[in-house]
UniProtKB/Swiss-Prot annotation:
Belongs to the methyltransferase superfamily. RNA methyltransferase RsmG family. This is Ribosomal RNA small subunit methyltransferase G. S-adenosyl-L-methionine binds at residues 66, 71, 119-120, 135. SUPFAM superfamilies: S-adenosyl-L-methionine-dependent methyltransferases. It comes from Rhizobium johnstonii (strain DSM 114642 / LMG 32736 / 3841). Gene3D superfamilies: Vaccinia Virus protein VP39.
């Protein structure tokens, strides 16, 4: 099996397939993603989310903010299972979604845990991480604000944020409050989308 042109092991493929089946089942009862995207689950969500790990395939500690339906947090945790290292802390305040995430991690034997708390409170439970991810949560300025407790003054912590066609405007807005190094990874799934890699964060105002 290939995702975004990269080979995926049979074990990881089976985990992803089990997650997809579980997702479809739970999505009938709770709103995990926009219903209009369910028919394109593999391309729109699983392949898209896989890009984060494919950009940074290291056995490290992640914090995934606003994990929702598990994109990209659970997908990253599934890939980490193959490496037998690293961990994903999934932060999701909605208790129904958090219950789904716990079930998904358990049934796929993925490397992660769920913190059913507000994003603003997550740093009190998870003090250290090497990478932060978020998808379809808020604009870049807001994401950097949420991530700042882990990233400010820490050269080894990076943010990986999925962004759509308005990402240049979001970058300009964020640079009004923050100074940071930036890499733009063009999406292999959506032509006008990117994954923004943020590092060396400093506060301006």
């Amino acid at each position: 099996m290939e995702l975004n042109g990269l080979r995926v092991s049979r074990e990881t493929q089976e985990r992803l397939q089990h997650f997809a089946a579980l997702f479809q089942k739970w999505a009938k009862a709770i709103n995990l993603v926009a219903p209009s995207t369910l028919d394109d689950l593999w391309h729109r969500h699983i392949a898209d989310s896989s890009q984060v790990f494919q950009i940074h395939p290291q056995p490290i500690t992640w914090v995934d903010l606003g994990s929702g339906g598990g994109f990209p947090g659970v997908i990253t945790a599934i890939f980490l299972a193959e490496l037998q290292g690293g961990w994903v802390h999934l932060v999701e305040s909605n208790h129904k979604k958090a219950a789904f995430l716990r079930t998904a991690l358990r049934e796929t034997n993925a490397r992660g845990s769920v913190h059913s708390i507000r994003i603003e409170d997550a740093y009190t439970e998870v003090r250290e991480c090497s990478a932060i991810s978020a998808r379809a949560l808020t604009d870049l300025d807001g994401l950097i604000g949420y991530s700042s407790p882990w990233m400010l003054g820490k050269e080894n912590c990076r943010g990986f944020f999925h962004k759509g066609r308005d990402y240049l405007r979001e970058i300009d807005k964020a640079r009004g409050r923050w100074e940071f190094d930036l890499l733009e990874h063009k999406s292999a799934v959506e032509q006008e989308s990117v994954i923004l890699e943020i590092s060396n964060l400093r506060r301006l105002v």
